[in-house]
Regions:
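Surface-exposed repetitive/solenoidal architectures
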Residues: 1-2, 34-37, 214-216, 252-253, ...
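Structural signature of tandem-repeat unit edges
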Residues: 1-7, 15-29, 39-52, 62-75, ...
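Active-site-proximal loop->helix
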Residues: 11
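Consensus positions within tandem repeat domains that build extended binding/scaffold surfaces
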Residues: 32-34, 54-59, 77-80, 99-102, ...
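Alpha-helical elements of the RecA-like P-loop NTPase motor core of helicases
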Residues: 249, 293-294
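A structural signal for leucine-rich repeat
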Residues: 273-276, 296-299
Length: 316
């Protein structure tokens, strides 16, 4: 028997929920943390009339295998289903956005996003290691930062060319990598398996936005060069094609990179890219390229760090 605490239509808490849980009629909202950590709860039936599911409402319910969400739900809060055990879920048609971290670290394998959804939130599916297929609506406008980061098995996703995609949104979604190991979506290159295979990373021609050009980890990698013995080391050099128009601050996240060669006139502004210091010594740009005033002066500390970088202009 599950004992519910309900206040003004909001289900605030369920004491020691186990097995199959049926939420009472008359409830209009599931409160924040209402079922947090209920690992012995296997299924949940939410009745019609519920309009809102609060923040972390079902967070860390690792034993939860199925949940019924009624068509009346229009709002799902941050981290509502973080670390949940279900593999599929049917979302209500009136839902207009997928909030921050809603499904991150969950056991989802596939999901279809309702037609009214315009935005997929920050870290909404991050770390869903078993997620393979996502069906996006045609009217989707924005996929925010880290939305699908580290969904290693994701291999099927339909993205319109006019969708705005945030920083690191598909980083290390290895199932989306091309035959050369690069993850390129709408001409944006994200952190890819190819960047973990060699000390010299050459971004493919046709890429217009560089989200990542080097691995995000700070540890040494094992490189497997063709015809050579495995080598342990860091990514040391990045080559950017002439097609590049934008280089995001996330492009060079760690300090072991020594050289950047750009065939593009796009501005290389470091911004927050090297927050722990850098070994960068040289940047080579094509003749005629222009740098913005004080390109490395994000703050006084950065300006001092980058004072020794050699910038060379030459025919590339």
């Amino acid at each position: 028997m599950n004992d519910f605490i309900i206040q003004d239509g909001v289900l605030v808490e369920c004491e020691e929920p186990t097995g199959d849980v049926v939420i009472p009629e008359g409830v209009t909202a599931i409160g924040s943390n209402a079922f947090w950590g209920a690992r012995n709860m296997h299924s949940v039936y939410i009745p019609d009339g519920v309009k809102k599911i609060g923040e972390s409402a079902f967070g860390a319910c690792s034993g939860l295998k199925s949940i019924r969400i009624p068509h009346t739900v229009t709002s799902i809060g941050t981290d509502a289903f973080v670390c949940c055990g279900f593999e599929t879920i049917e979302l209500p048609p009136k839902l207009s956005s997928i909030g921050e971290g809603v499904f991150r670290l969950s056991n989802l394998r596939e999901i279809s996003i309702p037609d009214k959804v315009k935005t997929i939130g920050y870290k909404s599916f991050k770390g869903c290691l078993h997620l393979e297929e996502v069906k996006l609506p045609q009217g989707l406008k924005l996929i925010k930062d880290d939305a699908f980061r580290d969904c290693h098995k994701l291999k099927n996703i339909n993205i319109s060319s006019d969708v705005e995609i945030g920083w690191s949104a598909f980083g290390m979604c290895n199932g989306l990598a091309d035959e050369d190991g690069f993850i390129i979506i709408n001409r944006i290159v994200f952190e890819s398996p190819a960047m973990h295979r060699t000390a010299i990373v050459e971004i493919p021609d046709g890429v217009e936005i560089v989200d990542h050009a080097t691995p995000s980890g700070d540890s040494e990698l094992v490189y497997y060069e063709k015809g050579k013995e495995p080598v342990t080391g860091f990514c040391r050099k990045v080559i950017l094609p002439s097609s590049v128009k934008t280089i995001r601050p996330t492009a060079f996240p760690w300090g072991n990179l020594v050289e950047i060669v750009s065939r593009s006139n796009a501005n290389i502004t470091v911004g927050l890219s090297f927050p722990w210091g850098t070994k960068l010594k040289k940047i080579t740009l094509p003749k005629g390229a222009e740098l913005p005033p004080n390109p490395f002066s994000y703050n006084a500390e950065y300006a001092k760090t980058f004072a020794g970088i050699k910038i060379v202009f030459e025919s590339i």
